[in-house]
Amino acid sequence: MSRVTLSRYLIEQTRSHNTPADLRFLIEVVARACKEISHAVSKGALGGVLGSMGTENVQGEVQKKLDVMSNEILLEANEWAGNLAGMASEEMDHPYQIPGRYPKGAYLLVFDPLDGSSNIDVNVSVGTIFSVLRCPSEYLNQNDTLREEAFLQPGTTQVAAGYAIYGPQTMLMLTLGNGVKGFTLDRELGSFVLTHDNISVPESTAEFAINMSNQRHWEAPVKRYVEELLAGKEGPLGKNYNMRWIASMVADVHRILTRGGVFMYPRDAREPEKPGKLRLMYEANPMSFIIEQAGGAATNGTQRILDIKPENLHQRVAVFLGSKQEVERITGYHAE
C-alpha cells in the first residue's frame, strides 16, 4: 500500500470534506517552513544557532537565535503565496503586514515559531505551534493596514491548527476540524507521511504534567487537585499517578496526545493581575483545538478555552488540557 503524504491527505480532504484549495496550499507552505526549521534545529552548535540574541520579545522574554530565525522562516515562506491577509507571532509586537507587492488571501496565520526555546541549548524537544483563522471580510481591503482587531476571534473560529515537534523524529500534528492526524517527516522522501490516524486522547489517565516548584503560588483548587493526585491509591482518586514535566508545551502536549494525561499551567499568586502564563492566540487556542478534536478537553479552570474572546493579541491564559475526565474534575473544583 502506498504511503499517504501530507499533500495527498490534503487533496483527499478537498475532495471528501470540501477543504478549500487555498487552505490546503497554506498548510503545505507552513509544513515546508517547519521542515526548514527542523533542519536548523537539528544542526545545533554546528550551525551556530544556539544561544541568545541579547534582545527581548513583546513578552519580555530573552530571544534565542533560533526564535528569531524560525520567525523569519515562517514569515518569508508565507508572505508571498497569496493565501494570507496577515500574520501574527509571539516574537512580534504587532501583526505582520503582507508586503504590497504580493497578493493577499482570505486567512490569518498566528504562530509561536519555536515553543520551548529555553530548552534548545540542552537538546530537549521544541516545536512550532500555529493557528489558522479566516480574516473577517471588513478587514480584507487590499490597500488597508491590517489591524490587530482582525485576529481577535475566539478559538471556535479556527479553521485549522497544528504543531511540529522537533525531537528524535520531526512530526506534524494537524487538525482541520475533523479529527487529528499525525505526520512524520521522511527525510529521504523529503515529505511528511501520515503515520498516526484518528488520534484519540484516553478519557482517564494516570499521568499529569505541572511545574511542581510553583506549588506554593497556586490557587486552592489546583493545590487540592494535585494533592489528591499525589495521595495515590490511598487517596480520594483511588489510583497512583506519575508526574511528567518537560517545560516545553509542544513536548508535554505531544505526550498527552499519544498516551493520555493532563497538562496544567495555572495562574499563580506571583502576578495576580495576569490570568496565566501561556498565550491564548498562538499557544492555548491551537493546542485546545487539537486536544478537543482528539476527544480531550481544555479549560482555563472556569471556562472552555475555545470560547474565550481575546482582548489583545498577546493575551495570557491559564491552561488545563488533556484527558477529559481529569480536566472536568479540576474545572469542577474551581466551580466549588
Swiss-Prot record:
Binding site for Mg(2+) 2: 112, 115, 283
Cofactor note: Binds 2 magnesium ions per subunit.
Recorded superkingdom: Bacteria
Keywords: Carbohydrate metabolism, Cytoplasm, Hydrolase, Magnesium, Metal-binding
One Gene Ontology molecular-function label: magnesium ion binding
Organism: Pseudomonas aeruginosa (strain UCBPP-PA14)
Obligatory cofactor(s): Mg(2+)
One Gene Ontology cellular component annotation held by this UniProt entry: cytosol
Protein name: Fructose-1,6-bisphosphatase class 1
Entries under Pfam families matching the protein: FBPase, FBPase_C
Subunit composition and interactions: Homotetramer.
Catalysed conversion reaction: beta-D-fructose 1,6-bisphosphate + H2O = beta-D-fructose 6-phosphate + phosphate
Residues involved in Mg(2+) 1 binding: 90, 112, 114
Main location: cytoplasm
Entry binding sites for substrate: 115-118, 211, 277
Gene Ontology terms: biological process: fructose 1,6-bisphosphate metabolic process; fructose 6-phosphate metabolic process; fructose metabolic process; gluconeogenesis; sucrose biosynthetic process
EC number: 3.1.3.11
Pathway: Carbohydrate biosynthesis; gluconeogenesis
Annotated localization: Cytoplasm
Family: Belongs to the FBPase class 1 family.
